[in-house]
């Protein structure tokens, strides 16, 4: 009994330590004993080590521990059965072509077998998950490595088609529509440089130019590529909105992508290494932007002349600038050296009024039967008589002058209410008129019925005539008898009346119809000289008998007879003239202003 209790206490003492496994697997071996009986030990084949699992949940059987100098098993290489040790003599081009062909076949075999995920120690960190509009994850491990293998195979196939003659891609290869490349912009290293502005250029022209040169599509993506408040809602853009600022280059050809990458990298390197004041790309962009906005200064030396420029160069610049300005002709005034938008006579219609006067003179000459002015004959006459004043009447195009035509026409506010159609000058006083108008007025003073003949003769000889006398020194024209009432044309308007003296000078059937239809109205201030109120007597060749005691038409006019008077009118005497009217009663002579005293230059006041 005591021996049993002592053995139990000894067993508890041996198993009292925690975490110890004191249960023997076999019979204790003693030094003095022989080897243990292997049959007495428990059988270990029944214990199975559970397999480990990958991160994605796939089972992985334990194998031999991999060492750094050991090579793993390559199932794809075993399936290809292609030699990897080249013992023959190959050129570098042949060796490169064989390596490309081998890698293409290896990738194709991996895609067929689905062995696309590399071992765990060769993987890169997984990116944040991304989901589509349906909530399905798009950047799984299999999708990412499959995309990488397909892009690598596409690049290798394009190289193989250029290096290997008559090369045919694998059967399961489908050429993608477009490939893309990413070029990151170092905004974190250079925060003060506007890379986006230099990549885009003025209104995006620099970016369009790079796209035309390379043939690839260039886009700017990432943080900072879109202004705040102008975000886009499309899913592809939102997927890269939080990435670093970069240029996304898309094309179907690898060479185009390489060319676009080179151009983009060149702009980035220039902006980061060249100072802002010496960056020619930025200067040209600013100049182009100013031209588009309309604020460009069109100078030969934009931005100031360099300090090292010599005097000859400055003279050449000034000559070129002066030649350019002298070639500019204003179409408003005809002068040189300024544009029409800068003309001082813009809106004054100077050339229009001069042309209107010239056209009016030509019209009057044509109506008078003199015809249109022949500029060739007039130039010849001016060349023969250089002292004439007709040069001023020629247009600048005939005289060869570059000066602007002078506007001699008075404004409408200074013309007054007169119906004087000959008052077209720019002078304020009535006696200070152009030679043409003064000669015309003098002819109207001296006319004796044949107005147009004298007017035409004096107008043609006005340049060679003697200086005119002032109005108070001119001789008084002879008085003419007033026309009878039946020859007066009071039913016409005031400015269309015909001169009474012309009606008395010639008979209506002997008068020139051409001159009768185009008579001029004398000025208002000369009408008093033609309206001399004399005693109503019959014109020469007419009888004293007629209507109311006035002279009537003579009998015997071819085809006409004396019309009888109205009933009762022949017995009524004419009404007496109003008292005090000179020239009506025949006793009072016509009064004229007295001549000025000696030594007085101006007219009497």
Curated annotation (Swiss-Prot):
> Where do the TM regions start and end?
none
The main place the protein resides is nucleus
Answer yes or no on keyword Metal-binding. yes
The entry's cellular-component GO terms read: nucleus; spliceosomal complex
Q: List the disulfide bonds.
A: none
Tell me a Gene Ontology molecular-function term this record carries: mRNA binding
Q: Which residues form the KH domain?
A: 184-264
Is-annotated flag, keyword Zinc? yes
Where do Basic and acidic residues bias regions lie?
A: 411-424
Q: Where in the cell does this protein reside?
A: Nucleus
Top-rank lineage group of the source organism: Eukaryota
| Gene3D superfamilies xrefs | 6.10.140.1790, K Homology domain, type 1, Zinc finger, CCHC-type
**Which region ranges are annotated with the description Disordered?**
1-75, 117-139, 294-319, 376-605
Composition-biased stretches, type Pro residues, lie in 468-484, 561-581, 591-605
Q: Which family does it belong to?
A: Belongs to the BBP/SF1 family.
> Could you tell me what this protein is called?
Branchpoint-bridging protein
Q: What's the source species' lineage?
A: Eukaryota, Fungi, Dikarya, Ascomycota, Saccharomycotina
Gene expressing this chain = BBP
